[in-house]
């Protein structure tokens, strides 16, 4: 939709039921070849055709074919939590094949994933590596946890991965060069495993050299992976780890944002964040934050909302919920897709491709995680 006007809040109807003329008798190899060439965003709709289609869409053969054909793409996943419920509801963004079927002008919806089971990962740190989403640490049942749960986004089923070496509360996890770095939340800050790294290929955990006991003792707020370095932000400042050299360096306070980072993401080695009605990006050369231009109209719709950012391929996904009066029973989850355009070394602009309501939920639901997996 045009970002100058919001869609009507009237009740919107949707029919995703496929045409009864759909041919269900094609050989599986032809169906696989055809489905592999279609955007993954349409798969939730095709899964409604029949059990046979549902099985094909969750089959490893389909995703092997997509990979061979170079058809993998970024797919957005979102978790919501009902008040006083530790379990999460997971959704994925899909496209409606025929926009005439819906009054949602953007043609996008959040639909539940196939798996009904989801680990209690409200306070876990969640990251994606390829087509797997990892929910790491706790608290779970009010206690630190070393558990790691994995959502396979191809078949949309959860499984358990090897546990961390130490249990953690509120850890921060970051993906760098295909490995997952985890810090914070451990009770013994002098432990050699205060910071750990997980290799999804070997399914093993290893310790990372500590930046110092003082830095580990102070609360770690955030972490990011940029230009081959693992950055930690916390009460003791900002430090960066170079895995190739095995060395920590103090970066200083110029980039430090601590708890004020409401939401952030890294796209093409550029750090973006949203807070206090502003989108900003970090200029490494000038060593200060610059305003992300071009999103002034979108910001008007973000007031009084909890905003989540996610790297969505080379684009940015922005999700937020609407402020609702006490008399309302439901609220709306919105999504915007932003193209990032660099005009010169000093200016980056965002262009809103579309934004729309993608889900309507009871107002007691909370938007928790937003991230993209490559499927």
From Swiss-Prot:
Looking at the keywords, is tRNA-binding present?
A: no
Q: Which UniProt keywords apply?
A: Kelch repeat, Repeat
Cysteine disulfide links: none
Q: Which organism is it from?
A: Arabidopsis thaliana (Mouse-ear cress)
Return the Kelch repeat spans: 132-178, 179-225, 229-269
SUPFAM superfamilies of this UniProt entry?
A: Kelch motif (SSF117281)
Q: What is this protein called?
A: F-box/kelch-repeat protein At4g39580
Per its UniProt record, what Gene3D superfamilies does this chain match? Answer: Kelch-type beta propeller
InterPro entries tied to this protein: F-box/kelch-repeat_ARATH, F-box_dom, Kelch-typ_b-propeller, Kelch_1
Pfam families, sorted: F-box, Kelch_FKB95
Organism phylogeny? Eukaryota, Viridiplantae, Streptophyta, Embryophyta, Tracheophyta
The chain positions of domain F-box read 20-66
Q: Which PANTHER family match?
A: BNAA06G40530D PROTEIN, F-BOX/KELCH-REPEAT PROTEIN SKIP4
The organism's place on the tree of life at top rank: Eukaryota
């Amino acid at each position: 939709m045009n970002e100058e006007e919001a869609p009507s809040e009237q009740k919107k109807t949707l029919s995703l039921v496929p045409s009864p003329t759909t041919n269900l008798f094609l050989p599986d190899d032809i169906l696989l070849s055809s489905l592999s060439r279609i955007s993954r965003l349409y798969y939730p709709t095709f899964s409604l055709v029949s059990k046979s289609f549902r099985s094909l869409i969750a089959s490893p053969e389909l995703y092997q074919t997509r990979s061979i054909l170079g058809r993998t793409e970024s797919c957005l996943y979102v978790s919501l939590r009902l008040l006083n419920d530790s379990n999460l509801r997971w959704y994925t963004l899909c496209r409606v094949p025929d926009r005439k079927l819906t009054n949602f002008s953007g043609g996008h919806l959040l639909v539940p994933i196939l798996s009904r089971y989801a680990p209690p990962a409200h306070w876990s740190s969640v990251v994606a590596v390829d087509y797997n989403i990892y929910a790491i640490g706790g608290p779970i049942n009010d206690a630190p946890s070393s558990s790691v749960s994995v959502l396979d986004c191809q078949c949309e089923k959860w499984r358990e991965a090897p546990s961390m070496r130490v249990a953690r509360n509120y850890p921060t996890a970051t993906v760098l060069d295909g490995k997952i770095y985890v810090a914070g939340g451990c009770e013994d800050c002098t432990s050699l495993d205060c910071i750990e790294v997980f290799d999804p290929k070997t399914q093993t955990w290893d310790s990372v050299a500590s930046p110092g006991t003082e830095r580990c003792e102070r609360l770690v707020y955030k972490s990011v992976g940029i230009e081959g370095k693992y950055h930690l932000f916390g009460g003791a400042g900002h430090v960066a780890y170079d895995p190739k050299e095995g060395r920590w360096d103090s970066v200083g306070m110029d980039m430090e944002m601590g708890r004020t980072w409401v939401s952030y993401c890294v796209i093409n080695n550029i750090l973006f964040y949203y807070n206090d009605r502003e989108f900003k990006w970090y200029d490494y050369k000038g060593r200060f934050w610059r305003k992300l231009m071009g999103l002034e109209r979108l910001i008007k719709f973000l007031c009084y909302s909890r905003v989540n950012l996610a790297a969505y391929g080379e684009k940015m996904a922005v999700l937020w919920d609407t402020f609702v009066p006490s008399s309302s029973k439901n609220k709306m989850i919105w999504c915007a897709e932003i193209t990032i355009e660099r005009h010169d070394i000093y200016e980056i602009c965002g262009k809103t491709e579309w934004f729309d309501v993608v889900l309507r939920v009871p107002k007691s639901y909370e938007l928790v995680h937003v991230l993209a997996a490559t499927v």
